[in-house]
Amino acid sequence: MSKTPRQGILAAGNFIVDYVKIIDGYPAQDMLASILSESRSNGGGPYNVLKDLAAMKVEFPLAACGLVGDDANGQWIKRDCQNHRIDVSMLHLSQEHPTSYTDAMTVQSTGRRTFFHCRGANAHFDLKHCGFGKTNARILH
């Protein structure tokens, strides 16, 4: 660890792509619902915290620590973090596992949501992915 004073936040854990799908109603099993619209956004506690802090334009460093797949979703997460001044040097890419994602099915008329989740790379995130000696973060979230 360097002698630089500690500053900023390192957020470690789940980095997820949320696919929000607005549907006309939740169907009974074996039935159909229409998807009216869909969007993609960040998901997972650490990712959400970092994005919120970036939106607040905080003046201290923000860093991500996690495991995403070496796929389109993983690249999207890395780009999104970089575009929001979030250091991704500890956001690792897995060759073996896809990026974790959630399909959030949202009923248009009620706002009620049901989630379908692929654990993907997050299920394999471990302490070995965290090089805590390589960070000067003051806070770990």
Language-model regions: role of each:
Residues 1-20, 67, 75-93, 97, ...:
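Ribokinase/PfkB-type carbohydrate-kinase core domain
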Residues 1-67, 72-79, 137:
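Glycine-rich phosphate/adenosyl-contacting loop at the front of the ribokinase-like
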